[in-house]
Amino acid sequence: NHIEMIYDYLIVGSGLFGTTMAYLLHQKGYKCLVIDKRSHIGGNVYTESVNGINVHKYGAHIFHTSDRRVWEFVNSLVEFNRYTNSPVANYKGKLYNLPFNMNTFYQMWGVTTPEEAKEMIEKQRRESGILSPKNLEEQAISLIGKDIYYTLIKDYTEKQWGRKATELPAFIIKRLPVRFTFDNNYFNDKYQGIPEGGYTRMIEKMLDGVEVRLNTDYFGNREYFDSIADRVIYTGEIDRFFDYRFGYLEYRTVSFETELLECRGELYGCRYSLYPYYRT
């Protein structure tokens, strides 16, 4: 039976990309349907308020860009705060600034000038004897030396990938962000911040006037959903979209443990702390 097209666009997934497409297309007069298999909008940037705190339910997401048009676009929707990502790593009770910069090198070796830091890194490179790195571990040591690798890279990387660093390919860490200035800003982009009121508020604004169906799995009735829209914009797992005929992609996930603590003021003194196996 012929089913009349009801929508110009079916958008599968209500994360940042799907929502942005829905917003822009709706602005141009197209009729869109957004579906999401989760019980909420926003995808992995979903936030909810807990005791006045905007909690990022799927891990922290800091918006950053050097494109002025993009920055003006998101700020036309909601106001962004001036959050600057400056994480610290806690290794055996000692704190190190990230990304690797002169503060890190001072904390690690006591050096105070870029020249001293470069000499220390070069010394450890030579001592490693690694000329042609065959895996991630060798690549990292050849780039930054053994001290920083074993203190700040190895454990967290192995947890992140679920494999030994010696089993991971070298290209994963071809470039390491290394700065020879006292700059703890994690990103090089010109603009960064987090939406005031959380990402969910921004997503809600973009979806205003757009039909949204939650708890709706595209693959639960794919033939039907494909039939009701002229075009489909899919933002989910790409291997599943092609029925795995090109193989299966390996996905890593994150386990979240939430603990509500009663405290006054700052608990850690920074928003983002890394431990050998955890982030807080």
What residues fall within each predicted segment?
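Short, Lys/Arg-enriched N-terminal segments with co-localized hydrophobic residues
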Residues: N1-E4
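N-terminal Rossmann-like FAD-binding beta1-loop-alpha1 element of flavoenzymes
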Residues: Y7-V34
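Short His-Asn-centered micro-motif
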Residues: V12-S14, I35-K37, T65-S66, G197, ...
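Glycine-rich FAD pyrophosphate-binding loop
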Residues: H26-N51
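Mid-domain catalytic core of redox enzymes
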Residues: K28, F219-T280
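Dinucleotide-binding Rossmann-like beta1-alpha1 core, especially the glycine-rich loop
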Residues: N51-E127
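Structural/interface elements that position substrates and couple domains in central-metabolism enzymes
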Residues: E72-S76, I148, Y268
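Active-site/ligand-binding neighborhood in enzyme catalytic cores
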Residues: K92-Y96, N103-R231, T235, R240-F242
